[in-house]
Amino acid sequence: MFLKVSVVILCILLATLIGLNLCGFSYWQLATQTLRNRLQATHVAVQPQRVNFEELDGLPAPVQRYFRKSLQNGQPMVVSVKMRHRGTFNLSQTVEKWHPFTSEQRVVTQRPGFAWNADIRLLLGVPIMVHDAYIAGEGILHAALFGLFSLVNIRGTGKIAEGQLMRFLAESAWYPTALLPSQGIHWQAVSDRSAQGTMTDGTICLTMLFTFNDQDLIERVEVESRGRTVDGKIIPTPWYGYFWNYTERSGMQVPLNGEVAWLLPDGAKPYWRGRIIEIIYEFTP
């Protein structure tokens, strides 16, 4: 009798999990498509349409070397990007709770914006779905169990927007034409292996430190203060992104692996480690 009851309970739990997964997947996919439509609607024409190394004159030496290494003179400019990632995500800011994730990301370079859709798997395959986005000056962070039950839902034009624009700038190593001066990035020398990049979008102006490796490619991007979500509040915290495993994609040198971390008083706390498994570019005609 006990065995029969246990089997029935197990079947009910399984059916519930399957139902939540199916319902949540449908709901989340609709929300994801809405985000992507909003992102695409912000797109404006990229000018100029070709990379011209003449605009590198006067830039800090490591920045010039980076562009000459990662781009080709005369190549078209990146308009948009579709990419897929796979990796692990640490769901705790105090202990190590790494879980596997897969994600898809859309990027438009002008007006700068992105929409990241992630699926983080817990035990028994229970999903946490995440939207991380910057669209038309608005920052968005929404995480939901099964895609249905919100765990975090923050959006706005304040610190959350600034933090998401920082992500766009840091990840420009994946779409390097967006870092050119003609695309609105101002560069200032720091050392022979580093420089500050400043960008402005709407009312947001931010500066990040770029460090270049021995191959003249972006190795690390960091900032002294980026908004970290703690108990539903935004806390300014030092942050970095680290990139490696550069490979040629569509004529550009881009990193396939990355790690991002908060720099807490007791040391670095990585929370995202991933690899690009597919990247598709749309270029200017």
Where are these regions (language model features)?
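N-terminal mature ectodomain segment of secretory-pathway/periplasmic proteins
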Residues: 64-150
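Hydrophobic membrane-insertion alpha-helices, especially the h-region
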Residues: 6-23
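Gly/Pro-enriched, hydrophobic low-complexity segments
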Residues: 197-281
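N-terminal leader/targeting segments and the immediate start of mature chains
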Residues: 31-82
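Aromatic-capped interface at the extracytoplasmic side
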Residues: 21-31
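Flexible, processing/modification-adjacent segments and terminal tails
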Residues: 142-201, 234
